[in-house]
């Protein structure tokens, strides 16, 4: 009897231990992947690209003068990633994934394929919104990219090197949030600001896919990586994602109007402050713009800006012309409703005014 009881206890202990091992394999990471994986998409695109004659490269400038290289449009196939963000089939991705596309096909885990409609694109933030025909799609929960901690888990899912098309499932890599609020300024017409940096491996084809936290919430859209050289394509653990809070705002605007409206009004007319004008006005300021008109009932008037004020700084940057003001606003991707900080010289004093950009009616 004692031997039987001992054997039973051993069996129970073994089974309990085995269950414990199996249970330990299910972590926050695996659960996060399981929750978001059904909503991760492979995006296959046919794009029109300029293709140059191969023999025209690396030639003597003499021949280039008489026989300039010629290009032609050619359909090229490429792939990227995306994430379904609603049960009615809206898909978020990068603009550069579907740029110049003549055909966009979306494949979901399991192999279901859909022709996607491009609802809208935004070149400046490098985001695009697609729509699948149908309903009751699996979709990802969107998190809050303003509530992140450096060092917390970050999981990248997507279609690196077209592997999704082979396995009919996304590839997942895990790392941490390495840094936040990374600003790269104006890059080839695009603005990459407040980017999330991660060491989760991101490779070619991951663009447009989700960066996920350990709760299974999308916190960013994977966009680009740093590589060892311009010829290397593999990840070295330095990848960047567009914060999901920005992506959500852009997607909502694309859903409504198909584009992002960046028109605005300052309610001001200004002229460059020249050396001659500064001497005539007898002011010590030699750099800035002078306000020559303030529109009645405008936000500028409400902010307390007056004719004759000399604006020297906008958002902490020195300015010398109205063009530089517009450049600062554009490169910060500011729109109507956003606030700009003005440093003003008036009657021997330096003042600070906050002007809300108005919409253009």
Positions of predicted regions on the chain:
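Conserved active-site neighborhood of the chymotrypsin/trypsin-like protease fold
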Residues: 18-26, 77-79, 84-165, 248, ...
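Glycine-biased strand-turn-strand hairpin within the trypsin-fold
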Residues: 18-91, 99-101, 112, 188, ...
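Active-site loop architecture of trypsin-fold serine endopeptidases
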Residues: 22, 51-53, 101-103, 137, ...
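Hydrophobic beta-strand signal
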Residues: 42, 86, 92, 105, ...
């Amino acid at each position: 009897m004692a031997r039987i009881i001992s054997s039973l206890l051993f069996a129970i202990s073994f089974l309990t231990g085995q269950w414990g091992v199996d249970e330990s394999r299910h972590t926050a990471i695996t659960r996060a992947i399981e929750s978001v994986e059904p909503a991760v998409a492979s995006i296959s695109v046919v794009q029109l690209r300029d293709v140059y004659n191969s023999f025209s490269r690396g030639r003597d400038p003499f021949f280039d003068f008489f026989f300039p290289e010629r290009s032609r449009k050619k359909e090229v196939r490429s792939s990227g990633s995306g994430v379904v963000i609603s049960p009615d089939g809206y898909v978020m991705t990068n603009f550069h994934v579907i740029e110049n596309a003549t055909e966009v096909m979306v494949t979901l885990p399991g192999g279901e394929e859909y022709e996607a409609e491009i609802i809208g694109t935004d070149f400046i933030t490098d985001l695009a919104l697609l729509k699948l025909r149908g309903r009751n799609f699996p979709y990802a929960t969107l998190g809050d990219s303003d509530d992140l901690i450096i060092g917390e888990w970050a999981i990248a899912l997507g279609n690196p090197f077209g592997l999704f098309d082979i396995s009919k499932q996304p590839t997942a890599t895990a790392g941490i949030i390495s840094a936040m609020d990374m600003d790269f300024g104006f890059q080839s017409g695009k603005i990459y600001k407040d980017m999330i940096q991660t060491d989760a491996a991101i490779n070619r084809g991951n663009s447009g896919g989700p960066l996920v936290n350990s709760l299974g919430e999308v916190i960013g859209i994977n966009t680009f990586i740093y590589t060892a050289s311009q010829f290397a394509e593999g990840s070295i653990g330095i990848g960047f994602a567009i914060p999901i809070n920005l992506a959500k705002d852009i997607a909502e605007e694309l859903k409504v109007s198909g584009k992002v409206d960046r028109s605005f009004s300052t309610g001001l007319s200004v002229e460059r402050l020249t050396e001659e004008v500064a001497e005539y006005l007898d002011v010590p300021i030699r750099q800035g713009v002078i306000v020559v008109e303030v529109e009645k009932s405008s936000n500028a008037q409400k902010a307390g800006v007056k004719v004759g004020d000399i604006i020297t700084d906008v958002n902490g940057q020195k300015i010398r012309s109205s063009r530089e003001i517009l450049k600062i606003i554009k490169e910060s991707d500011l729109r109507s409703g956003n606030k700009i900080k003005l440093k003003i010289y008036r009657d021997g004093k330096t003042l600070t005014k906050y002007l809300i950009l108005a919409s253009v009616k």
